[in-house]
Each structure stands twice: as structure tokens, then as C-alpha cells.
């Protein structure tokens, strides 16, 4: 049964992500009865995940602040501040942040992919182990229905 859910900033989990960025987990499947996951990235210039596709969920990116290059099915696009991208499942995609910093909202439906982010990243409320680095893991990605198609672009 679905219920309304309110998550104040202090209730949101913050994960260390690629290249020292932060992923704030705004809503997850537990909060939305599996319907969707919403995360917000604070990342620096050059941050780029591997070129990949999702087999279980559709994805929307809203670039709140900053600029990026986006690749969708091998087509390259420039995404300006305020731009939005819809990525249906099974469409290979990737991005690279081209501004000094970027604020990127990500919505996935249905939920589930947050498990990959939690297993790959590090909860920033815990001590940082010496030498810790977020590294994409193809096996872990596959566990959550993601297929790494190639290196970051």
C-alpha cells in the first residue's frame, strides 16, 4: 500500500560517489513502495560514469546547475543548465560534467538501483577508510540490472 512520505535533508543518506562527488539519496524504494528512486548528485568537472544501460528502470536526469555532455545510444548532446534527459531502459548512455561543479537530479522508475549506489559508494556518516575510492564494478552493476557497455566518455 502506498503512502505519502516526507524526507527532510537530515534524513537523507549522503553517499560518497565517483571522483569524490556526493549522491544524496532523497527517496528510495522503501519510501515509495518500490515505485521510484530519486537522488541528487553534487559532482565536479570531469565526473563521468561508465557508458551503460539499465535493463530494469527508466531514468530521468535534470541538470539543475552546471553543464554536461550526454551520450544516448551513441549520439552526443550538450546539456545546459536546466536541461532534462529521459533515458528509457535498454538505451546505452553516459555523461561527463563540463562545468566546475554540477547539481544533477536523477529519477529512476521503478526503484531498486539505489542498492547499487549504496553497495558501491560510501555512507558519508561513517569514517572514511584509508585509500577508499569509488570504483564501478561490472558484477555489482549486473546484480542490479545495469550493463556496463564501455568506459566513461
Q: Language-model features: where?
A:
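Ligand-binding loop in jelly-roll beta-barrel domains
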Residues: 32, 89-114
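Glycine- and acidic-residue-biased ligand/ion/polar-headgroup-sensing regions
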Residues: 56-58, 62-68, 73
Amino acid at each position: 500500500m502506498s503512502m505519502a512520505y516526507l524526507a527532510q535533508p537530515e534524513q537523507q543518506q549522503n553517499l560518497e560517489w565517483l571522483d569524490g562527488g556526493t549522491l544524496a539519496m532523497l527517496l528510495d524504494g522503501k519510501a515509495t513502495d518500490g515505485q521510484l528512486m530519486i537522488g541528487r548528485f553534487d559532482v565536479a568537472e570531469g565526473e563521468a560514469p561508465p557508458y551503460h544501460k539499465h535493463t530494469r528502470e527508466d531514468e530521468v536526469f535534470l541538470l539543475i546547475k552546471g553543464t554536461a555532455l550526454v551520450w544516448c545510444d551513441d549520439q552526443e548532446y550538450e546539456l545546459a543548465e536546466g536541461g532534462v534527459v529521459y533515458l528509457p531502459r535498454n538505451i546505452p548512455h553516459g555523461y561527463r560534467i563540463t562545468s566546475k561543479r554540477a547539481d544533477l537530479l536523477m529519477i529512476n522508475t521503478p526503484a531498486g538501483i539505489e542498492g547499487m549506489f549504496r553497495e558501491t559508494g560510501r555512507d558519508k556518516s561513517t569514517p572514511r577508510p584509508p585509500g577508499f575510492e569509488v570504483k564501478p564494478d561490472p558484477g555489482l552493476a549486473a546484480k542490479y540490472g545495469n550493463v556496463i557497455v564501455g568506459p566513461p566518455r
